[in-house]
Amino acid sequence: MKRTYQPSKRKRTNSVGFRARMATKSGRNLLNRRRRHGRHSLIDL
C-alpha cells in the first residue's frame, strides 16, 4: 500500500512557504503574529 505522505519540496514550499503566506490576508496575519511573538523562524518548512 502506498503511504499517504509523499514529501516534495516544491509542493510544500508552494503551500506553506513565505510567498504563499504573503499572498493571503490570514497568512500575513500569521507572519505578524510570529513576529510579535519573537520567533526565530517565521515559517516552518
Curated annotation (Swiss-Prot):
Q: What is this protein called?
A: Large ribosomal subunit protein bL34
Query: Which InterPro entries does this chain map to?
Result: Ribosomal_bL34, Ribosomal_bL34_CS
Chain's gene name: rpmH
Q: Which family does it belong to?
A: Belongs to the bacterial ribosomal protein bL34 family.
GO MF terms here are: structural constituent of ribosome
- Keywords attached to this entry: Ribonucleoprotein, Ribosomal protein
The species this protein was found in = Chlamydia muridarum (strain MoPn / Nigg)
- KW DNA-binding (keyword) present: no
- Reading the lineage from the top rank, the first entry is Bacteria
Q: Which GO terms describe its biological process?
A: translation
Q: Which GO terms describe its cellular component?
A: ribonucleoprotein complex; ribosome
Which Pfam families does the record associate with it?
Ribosomal_L34
